[in-house]
Amino acid sequence: MSGKAHKTTQNSALQGISEQENFMIRVLFICHGNICRSPMAEYVMKDLVKKSNLSDQFHISSAATSTEEIGNPVHRGTRAKLAQAGIACEGHHARQMTRADYDGYDYLIGMDEWNIRNIKRITGGDPEGKIFKMMSFAGSSRDVADPWYTGDFEATWKDVTEGCQGLLQYILEENGKASKK
């Protein structure tokens, strides 16, 4: 595997990561609370990767920049949108990202500008160019719509699916793999 895919077997501070997963392309989606946008992106991306027969080549997760929702499940609005698409999200509990996540992931994807600033604060910067804003993969500089304030999970779904599709294409191209659409 070429490109940004993890090739090291060094032990990171991340829990639950096996040796095999260290050879995967590792993506972490990040929002403020890890109950609405970032878990939606996590499960949409897992679904896209599965449908592309690439599940064995990816490790996908999500986290928060804040401590406000730690331990809480996916928001009911996000669960409902995922369920409408036949995507399960059981077992997810919000967690806060750590500095170690920077070393453990190839792509850290923030949902908005505020998230990006907080991610860089937590990680101490972005010397390896791993931090991206989600909508940049959909050809936009805007933020992913935040349903926490609007209640509009449909707008968030549209942003997340466009962003995830663009991100998957970007990753496949960067790692020298042909898209399996």
Language model features: what each stretch is:
Residues 31, 82, 109-110, 160:
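Hydrophobic structural packing positions in well-ordered secondary structure
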Residues 3, 17-104, 169-181:
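Conserved active-site segments centered on acidic
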Residues 107, 113-181:
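Phosphate-binding/catalytic loops
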